[in-house]
Swiss-Prot record:
Name of the coding gene: Dnajc10
Annotated spans, Trxb 1: 235-350
Protein's recorded name: DnaJ homolog subfamily C member 10
Record carries keyword Transcription: no
BP terms from Gene Ontology: ERAD pathway; intrinsic apoptotic signaling pathway in response to endoplasmic reticulum stress; protein folding in endoplasmic reticulum; response to endoplasmic reticulum stress
Length: 793
């Protein structure tokens, strides 16, 4: 028997059903949303090292090799592998934080290694506190901090690297405190390793600011490594005697430096010469190290009431011959590290600045200031006491300020928790807060960069909302790793942009209202304010690309096309003109990711290919008319033929500047000449023009990648140097005679030399601009020689 519902009951039940369906939909969506951070079990603030450690733990547990009976093992592992691939990469992590997985459509990944790789090869130094795994973004700052670094460049698959690992760990423990021990994974940071000239593994280099890197070529025993490291440690041990004792002590005390002295008597224990050298290196600039032979200097030791072997630290101003009144620290250990830690703990803390003197002191000098609230937390890391000495040559003083003594001052600076900041000699107006790691080398790098940069900490009182000058403002959150990675690059960019535009940072965890006003939804968000115009930066986190972005705002490389200008410039283009056009929509995440790459590509194609873009949100009906069915839609319009509307659509997977440029150049007529053995001999070797020749093989992948770059080069040097190509598969004897041992190989053949040789000069670059600059430099030198020879005749 049916049941009839009245209207009210029907509406009520319909609402219930709709609510249930909505809840079900939300559950399904949430259940399928794979948050990469939660997949790895890390927070959004996790460091690269924490992400590697979390992934390794999961990889060893979930790897398909260890779960052969689980049909879902492959799929489950792909998920965590994908999460790791994205979060380990700074740029992909930024895209993911901002757009979610939508922003990663061009970076699918999907490959993983065997279980044994993750067990034995992956992150081999991540669990060693004495060894710091350095990444590209922090490497230069670390090795230029002023500390001595010994760095192991290794590859995960290298057996010799694994053979060295146990020794490297023992060595790191042995020299801890004397120098920094680092490691670079060249499997993850290939570009960094290439930049540092690393072409074999393991490669061990010593680095110190102001000196060239020194490669270690000895045997890989711990003793040999220690001996090599000690050659580069600055250590001076003074033998004290009646003749020099008083002057040495008084001179050091006057400079605020104390003495560590070991008094040695025959048959009794005192610090060995090797231990004294190590302590001198560890305490370099902080404490002088000396020793007294009490058998030879009996009267001196007796005057100091020392009758047995003793080691003591004499702080500045210590009374040497009255132990009861003196602040002398007597040391019972013979171990260098134990003595070092005890002395460091007893060194005086940084100067405490008072509220009354703060503004005046900061106005007349550059300062690194530690802010604390009551208890001084810096005491937990006594190594930070080295800062005063290591920053002395930079003319940066180091002090501390207790915010509990003057809360108003800290509140005005937006300091609400313990932190440190650099003040640039203009009082409290110009300062920058440190958001990096609270470890010595990171703070050193920050202080040196900050005092020489032009980055301003912004707040409501100085935010450039209506400033007539252009500003680049970085909206960030201190907990966000990509934000922290961007800050050093902003400092570099600010020095290069000084006088052109100002650079500032705004902490959105403090100034939430300002960030909401500008609709900041992800961190970091970097924006250029130019009076009424606002432009958001979407590029990579590098000073170079920030500068490119600014230059593109001044001189746009991409033509913004309207339906009218599209018809005029593209459809009615001249016979020899070509265009590449990006049809996009501002709300489309892949379009937003593409835009900086599109602009970068356009700059490299200036004079060769016209580049434009069409906003399909603004000109929707026009894009529909042009049959644009997806975003972004990239089209190439070739040299005009009878088919004016002919175009080619880009279907490639990668939408980076290099891939897009190669695709576009592939449609241009060949500018280089295909050479045969006969034409190579007649035109290149016996001809009266300069030639640059690309020796290649059709099956060679790098040759195929280089081909469009060589075509670009041919166009750049047209009229001055001719460009040719030799197919080494078709003409092996020609290539063999030219001494070709690898593909591609590029050689320059210069006319007017004494005699052209088939070997000539090889060019090792694969960048068209670099090759062109090198060629022009060679030709200029050659012309000078020819002119000089003619003058002599």
């Amino acid at each position: 028997m049916g049941v009839w519902l009245n209207k009210d009951d029907f509406i009520r039940d319909l609402k219930r059903i709709s609510l249930c369906l909505l809840i079900l939909y939300v559950v399904v969506v949430v259940g399928t949303d794979q948050n990469f951070y939660s997949l790895l079990g890390v927070s959004k603030t996790a460091s690269s090292r924490e992400i590697r450690q979390a992934f390794k733990k999961l990889a060893l547990k979930l790897h398909p090799d260890k779960n052969p009976n689980n049909p879902n093992a492959h799929g489950d592992f792909l998920k965590i592998n994908r999460a790791y691939e994205v979060l380990k990469d700074e740029d992909l992590r930024k895209k993911y934080d901002k757009y979610g997985e939508k922003g990663l459509e061009d970076n699918q990944g999907g490959q993983y290694e065997s279980w044994s790789y993750y067990r034995y090869d992956f992150g081999i130094y991540d669990d060693d506190p004495e060894i710091i795994t350095l990444e590209r973004r922090e490497f230069d700052a670390a090795v230029n901090s002023g500390e001595l670094w010994f760095v192991n460049f290794y590859s995960p698959g290298c057996s010799h690297c694994h053979d060295l690992a146990p020794t490297w760990r023992e060595f790191a423990k042995e020299v801890d405190g004397l120098l920094r021990i680092g490691a670079v994974n060249c499997g993850d940071d290939r570009m960094l390793c290439r930049m540092k000239g690393v072409n074999s593994y393991p490669s061990l280099f010593i680095f110190r600011s102001g000196m060239a890197a020194v490669k270690y070529n000895g045997d890989r025993s711990k003793e040999s490594l220690v001996a090599f490291a000690m050659q580069h440690v600055r250590s001076t041990v003074t033998e004290l005697s009646t003749g020099n004792f008083v002057n040495a002590i008084e001179t050091a005390f006057a400079a605020g430096v104390g003495w560590l002295i070991t008094f040695c008597s025959k048959g009794e224990d005192c610090l060995t010469s090797q231990t004294r050298l190590r302590l001198s290196g560890m305490l370099d600039g902080l404490v002088n190290v000396g020793w007294v032979d009490c058998d030879a200097q009996d009267s001196l030791c007796k005057s100091l009431d020392t009758t047995a072997s003793t080691t003591a630290y004499f702080p500045p101003g210590a009374t040497l011959n009255d132990r009861e009144k003196s602040s002398v620290l007597f040391l019972n250990s013979l171990d260098a590290k134990e003595i070092y830690m005890e002395i460091i703990h007893n060194l005086p803390d940084f100067e405490l600045l008072s509220a009354n003197q703060l503004e005046d002191r900061l106005a007349h000098h550059r300062w690194l200031v530690f802010f604390h609230f009551g208890k001084n937390e810096n005491a937990n890391d006594p190594e930070l006491k080295k800062l005063k000495t290591l920053l002395k040559n930079e003319h940066i003083q180091v002090g501390r300020f207790d915010c509990s003594s003057a809360p108003g001052i800290c509140s005005d600076l937006y300091v609400f928790q313990p932190c440190l900041a650099v003040f640039k000699g203009q009082g409290t107006k110009e300062y920058e807060i440190h958001h990096g790691k609270k470890i010595l080398y990171d703070i050193l790098a920050f202080a040196k960069e900050s005092v020489n940069s032009h980055v301003t900490t912004l707040g409501p009182q100085n935010f450039p909302a209506s400033d007539k000058e252009p500003w680049l403002v970085d909206f960030f959150a201190p907990w966000c790793p990509p934000c922290r990675a961007l800050l050093p690059e902003l400092r570099k960019a600010s020095t290069l942009l000084y006088g052109q535009l100002k650079v500032g940072t705004l902490d959105c965890t403090i100034h939430e209202g300002l960030c909401n006003m500008y609709n900041i939804q992800a961190y970091p968000t970097t924006v250029v304010f130019n009076q009424s115009s606002i432009h958001e930066y979407e590029g990579h986190h590098s000073a170079e690309q920030i500068l490119e972005f600014i230059e593109d705002l001044r001189n746009p490389s991409v033509v913004s096309l309207t339906p009218s200008t599209f018809n005029e410039l593209v459809k009615q283009r001249k016979h020899d003109e070509v265009w590449m056009v990006d049809f996009y929509s501002p709300w489309c995440h892949p379009c937003q990711v593409l835009m900086p790459e599109w602009k970068r590509m356009a700059r490299t194609l200036t004079g060769l290919i016209n580049v434009g873009s069409v906003d399909c949100q603004q000109y929707h009906s026009f894009c529909t008319q042009e049959n644009v069915q997806r975003y972004p839609e990239i089209r190439f319009y070739p040299q005009k033929s009878s088919k004016a509307y002919q175009y080619h659509s880009y279907n490639g997977w990668n939408r980076d500047a290099y891939s897009l440029r190669s695709w576009g150049l592939g449609f241009l007529p060949q500018a280089s000449i295909d050479l045969t053995p006969q034409t190579f001999n007649e035109k290149v070797l016996q001809g009266k023009t300069h030639w640059v020749v690309d020796f290649y093989a059709p099956w060679c992948g790098p040759c195929q990648n280089f081909a469009p770059e060589f075509e670009l080069l041919a166009r750049m040097i047209k009229g001055k140097v001719r460009a040719g190509k030799v197919d080494c598969q078709a003409y092996p004897q020609t290539c063999q005679k030219a001494g070709i041992k690898a593909y591609p190989s590029v050689k320059l053949y210069q006319y007017e030399r004494a005699k052209k040789s088939i070997w000539e000069e090889q060019i090792n670059s694969r960048d068209a601009k670099t090759i062109a600059a090198l060629i022009y430099g060679k030709l200029e030198t050659l012309q000078s020689q020819v002119k000089r020879n003619k003058d002599e005749l």
